[in-house]
A protein has these predicted regions:
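Short acidic/glycine-enriched loop/turn segments that link adjacent beta-strands
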Residues: 33-37, 97-99
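Nucleic-acid nuclease catalytic cores
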Residues: 79-107
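Mg2+/Mn2+-dependent nuclease catalytic core
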Residues: 58-77, 81
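Acidic-basic catalytic patches of nuclease active cores, encompassing PD-(D/E)XK
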Residues: 1-33
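Short coil/turn segments at beta-strand junctions that form active-site/ligand-binding loops
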Residues: 26, 47-49, 87-88
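Intrinsically disordered, low-complexity terminal regions enriched in charged/polar residues
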Residues: 100-141
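Conserved catalytic cores of phosphodiester-cleaving nucleases, focusing on short active-site segments
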Residues: 39-41, 45-61
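A short local loop/turn or secondary-structure capping micro-motif enriched for an aromatic residue
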Residues: 38, 60-63, 109-112
């Protein structure tokens, strides 16, 4: 079984995203790990789920790299959820200078990727690389 790497900093970043989306009229509801994505997004006015999302935070600016990477299993899960519910699923990234989103259904490139700083061989896997040019800026700071 893989270790859990979610930290308090990760939870703080998710709260920051929730606060930024609340300014736009949306609430985030944390989903159980078994669901495969982080949150359901609810329209506060209509009080219904309008999308699902996986949230990542990066410690650099949005345009530092030409793509944003995420594990392919998250993309597959997002596609399954969207196919079942008819609702979009988004990859939301909190950068140092912006909060951005892209629909998981957007085009991406498949390559090996991941990290090596934790010494966990399972951190390297098949990943989806979404072009930064395809992201929509939700908030700029």
């Amino acid at each position: 079984m893989r270790p859990m790497y979610e930290t308090q900093a990760d939870r703080n970043n998710e709260q920051r995203v929730a606060d930024l989306l609340a300014e736009k009229g949306y609430s985030l509801d944390k989903l159980p790990m078994s669901f495969g994505l982080d949150v359901a997004i609810t329209d506060d006015f209509e009080e219904k789920i309008v999308a699902f999302a996986e949230i990542k935070a990066r410690t650099f600016e949005m345009n530092k790299y030409p793509t944003a990477m995420i594990n392919l299993h998250k993309v597959i899960r997002a596609h399954d959820i969207s196919a079942c519910t008819g609702l979009p699923s988004y990859f939301i990234v909190l950068y140092r200078d912006a909060l951005v989103r892209i629909n998981f259904a957007s085009e991406f490139e498949v390559k090996m990727g991941g990290r090596s700083d934790r010494g966990d061989p399972a951190d390297r896997d098949v990943c989806a690389y979404y072009p930064i040019s395809g992201f929509t800026v939700v908030s700029q700071f």
